[in-house]
């Protein structure tokens, strides 16, 4: 539930289809569990690290360039997985120790602070003319307050889902402020096929230096984040997922 917001927010910010993001997120998670032999309890969602390059490629060259870039990143993950399998996990952990991985994860979150603030302060943070909204700011503060309270005060299972509780509280507050429009939900069909973008049908894949230079180098950021996530997840579960089923399997499945 906590990942749902992020998985939907990234395609909204980048101009992609949230329905496709949810579908591929689910399929990708199933593939990940298959590759890792079902031993790592993880869910794959959208990565915030690629927001800026995807927006740039989408605006300059179209959605096809962004999709080709995503495919290249998957190849990079596969190559790194082969490298880890060949040299061992100790070598990669020596190259990316916790003192490096930790700040990388922090930078990813902090780099999105301006986006969060803009969405909390303005009626439409993507508009050319920004209109300040005290209502949005109040709801954002209510959501943040509930999330912090639940994270600090609540115990057991509820302490694990403060983001979900915060989102729920913020949504209820939005209802009282009258800014929730149910009409799109009422008008939407019960079942609808997502708006797929098919290569060689909707666009012709082209490999350019622009795509390579904008997408491939950034792969080191989510790879570092992935390694940190595995170490933290292992601590929580009391297992060493880096050794079993192995970091190479986890990286390959993530890619």
Give the label of every model feature segment:
Residues 4-5, 20-30, 47-51, 75, ...:
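Hydrophobic alpha-helical segments embedded in the membrane of multi-pass proteins
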Residues 59-184:
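Membrane-embedded alpha-helical modules
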Residues 1-3, 132-144, 161, 197-229, ...:
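Hydrophobic, membrane-embedded alpha-helices of multi-pass small-molecule transporters
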Residues 8-14, 51-60, 90, 114, ...:
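Generic transmembrane alpha-helix signature in multi-pass membrane proteins
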Residues 4-8, 143-150, 161, 172, ...:
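Juxtamembrane interface elements at the cytosolic ends of transmembrane helices
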Residues 1-41, 49-59:
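N-terminal signal-anchor module of multipass membrane proteins
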Residues 15-33, 214-255:
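Membrane-embedded helical hairpins/re-entrant loop segments and their flanking transmembrane helices
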Residues 16-23, 38-50, 92-101, 158-165:
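Short, non-helical or kinked segments that cap or interrupt transmembrane helices
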């Amino acid at each position: 539930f906590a990942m749902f917001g992020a998985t939907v927010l990234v395609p909204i910010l980048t101009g992609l289809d949230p329905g496709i993001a949810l579908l591929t997120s689910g399929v990708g998670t199933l593939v990940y569990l298959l590759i890792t032999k079902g031993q790592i309890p993880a869910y794959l969602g959208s990565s915030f690290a690629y927001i800026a390059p995807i927006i740039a490629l989408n605006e300059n060259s179209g959605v096809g360039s962004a999709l080709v870039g995503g495919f290249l990143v998957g190849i990079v993950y596969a190559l790194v997985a082969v490298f880890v399998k060949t040299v061992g996990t100790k070598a990669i952990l020596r190259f990316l120790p916790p003192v490096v991985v930790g700040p990388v994860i922090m930078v990813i979150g902090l780099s999105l602070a301006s986006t969060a603030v803009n969405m909390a302060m303005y009626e439409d943070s993507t508009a050319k003319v920004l209109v300040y909204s005290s209502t949005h700011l109040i709801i954002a503060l209510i959501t943040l307050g509930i999330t912090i309270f639940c994270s600090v005060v609540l115990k057991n299972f509820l302490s694990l889902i403060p983001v979900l509780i915060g989102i729920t509280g913020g949504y209820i507050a939005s209802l009282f402020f009258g800014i929730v429009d149910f009409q799109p939900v009422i008008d939407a069909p019960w079942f609808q096929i997502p708006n797929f973008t098919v290569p060689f049908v909707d666009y012709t894949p082209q490999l350019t230096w622009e795509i390579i230079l904008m997408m491939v180098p950034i792969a080191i950021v989510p790879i570092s984040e992935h390694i940190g996530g595995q170490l933290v997840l292992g601590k929580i579960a009391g297992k060493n997922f880096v050794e079993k089923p192995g970091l190479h399997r986890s990286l390959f499945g993530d890619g």
